[in-house]
């Protein structure tokens, strides 16, 4: 029985020259020479580069099948690994047998025909776009980053916690949530006041898709000390931008007995760890992004790893922006939420390095962030990266029950709705901190792909839930 190998193993020299091997994949291109040879570029997704298979016209199905192969056909090719005289790859396959597993029905109308497609067009055929160079490379980088995140936390002694996707609480207090209901929309039950009676719904109360796993994560951090969540989150924001998705993935660590300084250190260590991993493990894909998408991809990651994070208080950051002499689209004053242009000025022009901005005004931050002694600011932080702006947002959590209750009431929230969250402060409360990393934002940063819809397999956005 001939050994079956992935193309990456053949190209990386794990199969000896002269060994017979079978590869399975899809045709990227076929070209024929007058000398009675066909050159098949075959990919299987295991790496960026295809392998070249040389097929002689003495193969039994050469005329009937090999010469009919087009982009997208699936093949099983058995042959001998030989040194390649061609530039760009060390080895190729001298084919002895070509079996066609699947034909492309009509090559003329095949949506992934061998030509340059716009990234916008690829979104319309999201079920086929993984076959392209760019989306295949994004998928491998996404996998590498996810594995590196899990590895980092495991090595640091964190436990992964699966927080629920269905919830009754709004972590952000923003109200932009997707409702989960089995009620008959044609015949909604009403209470005495005419409002929808959610007590008759599946969960017996109003329920939503989660906007964050943080609150649930805190409960486990207050028992296991160090945890993280990594899963999908949902926002019903009507935002049609290159930066927003209705469904996206979040990485949310939570640490007991931790301060804002511990939080910032964890964020720095994690980002540098995953960037080192992707530079090491996905060189082939990053070289493609560097050549075709963003020339600075590799140098940006290397600079990030080699930079010490700057730290600045929000109040001082506002002063830096006011003194910059720059005319910003959004005016700068104490109390504003920093916009992307402000964040990028700080990271790219002022500090020329990643920067942690901390201690934000309480009025622009969430109820669970720890109130500072000045009574005006909270122990919040944002990590700003050159080239994108905010990449991580986090805070030290409010561990004092009386202060937490007061903040909730100030923000129009009912403390009773958060009774279980408040219990953490009643029974052995502890200073703790955590942050959120939008996973797709991270992939955008690493690949240079500008639209967030192109770094998630099936993007969900306003009026778009195809596939």
UniProtKB/Swiss-Prot annotation:
Its main location: cytoplasm. CDD domains: AsxRS_core (cd00776), EcAsnRS_like_N (cd04318). One of its GO terms (molecular function) is asparagine-tRNA ligase activity. One of its GO terms (cellular component) is cytoplasm. The keyword Protein biosynthesis applies. It catalyses: tRNA(Asn) + L-asparagine + ATP = L-asparaginyl-tRNA(Asn) + AMP + diphosphate + H(+). It holds the Pfam family tRNA_anti-codon. Its EC number is 6.1.1.22. Homodimer. Belongs to the class-II aminoacyl-tRNA synthetase family. PANTHER family: ASPARAGINE--TRNA LIGASE, MITOCHONDRIAL-RELATED, ASPARTYL/LYSYL-TRNA SYNTHETASE. This is Asparagine--tRNA ligase. The lineage of its organism: Bacteria, Pseudomonadati, Pseudomonadota, Gammaproteobacteria, Pasteurellales. The gene is asnS.
């Amino acid at each position: 029985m001939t050994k079956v190998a992935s193309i990456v193993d053949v190209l990386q020299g794990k199969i000896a020259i002269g060994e017979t091997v079978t590869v399975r994949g899809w045709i990227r291109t076929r070209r024929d020479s007058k000398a009675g040879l066909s050159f098949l570029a075959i990919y299987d997704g295991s790496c960026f580069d295809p392998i070249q298979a040389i097929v002689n016209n003495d193969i039994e199905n050469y005329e009937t099948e090999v010469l009919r192969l087009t982009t997208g056909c699936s093949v099983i090719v058995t042959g001998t690994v030989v040194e390649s005289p061609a530039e760009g790859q060390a080895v190729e396959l001298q084919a002895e047998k070509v079996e066609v597993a699947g034909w492309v029905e009509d090559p003329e109308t095949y949506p992934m025909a061998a030509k340059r497609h716009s990234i916008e067009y690829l979104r319309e055929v999201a079920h086929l776009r993984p076959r392209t160079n760019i989306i295949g490379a994004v998928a491998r980088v996404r996998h590498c980053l996810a594995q590196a995140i899990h590895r980092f936390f495991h090595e640091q002694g964190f436990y992964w916690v699966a927080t629920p996707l269905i919830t009754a609480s709004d972590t952000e207090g923003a109200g932009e949530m997707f409702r989960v209901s089995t009620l008959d929309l044609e015949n909604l039950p009403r209470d005495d006041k005419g409002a929808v009676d959610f007590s008759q719904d599946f969960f017996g109360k109003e329920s939503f898709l989660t906007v964050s796993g943080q609150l649930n994560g805190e409960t486990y951090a207050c028992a296991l000390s160090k945890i993280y969540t990594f899963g999908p989150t949902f926002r019903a924001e009507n935002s049609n931008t290159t930066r927003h998705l209705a469904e996206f993935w979040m990485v949310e660590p939570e640490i007991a007995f931790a301060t804002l300084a511990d939080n910032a250190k964890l964020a720095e260590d994690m980002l540098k760890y995953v960037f080192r991993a992707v530079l090491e493990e996905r060189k082939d894909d990053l070289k493609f992004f560097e050549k075709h998408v963003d020339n600075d991809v590799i140098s940006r990651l290397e600079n990030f790893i080699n930079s010490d994070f700057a730290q600045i208080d929000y109040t001082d950051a506002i002063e830096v922006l006011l003194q910059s002499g720059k005319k910003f689209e959004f005016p700068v004053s104490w109390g504003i939420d920093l916009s992307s242009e402000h964040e990028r000025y700080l990271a790219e022009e002022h500090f020329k390095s990643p920067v942690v901005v901390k201690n934000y005004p309480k009025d622009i931050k969430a109820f669970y962030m720890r109130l500072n002694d000045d009574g005006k600011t909270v122990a919040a932080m944002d990590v700003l990266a050159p080239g994108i702006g905010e990449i991580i947002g986090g805070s030290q959590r409010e561990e004092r029950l009386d202060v937490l209750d007061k903040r909730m009431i100030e923000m129009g929230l009912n403390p009773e709705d958060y009774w279980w969250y408040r219990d953490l402060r009643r029974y052995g409360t502890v200073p703790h901190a955590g942050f959120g990393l939008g996973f797709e934002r991270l992939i955008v940063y690493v690949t240079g792909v500008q639209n967030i819809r192109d770094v998630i397999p099936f993007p969900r956005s306003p009026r778009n839930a195809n596939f």
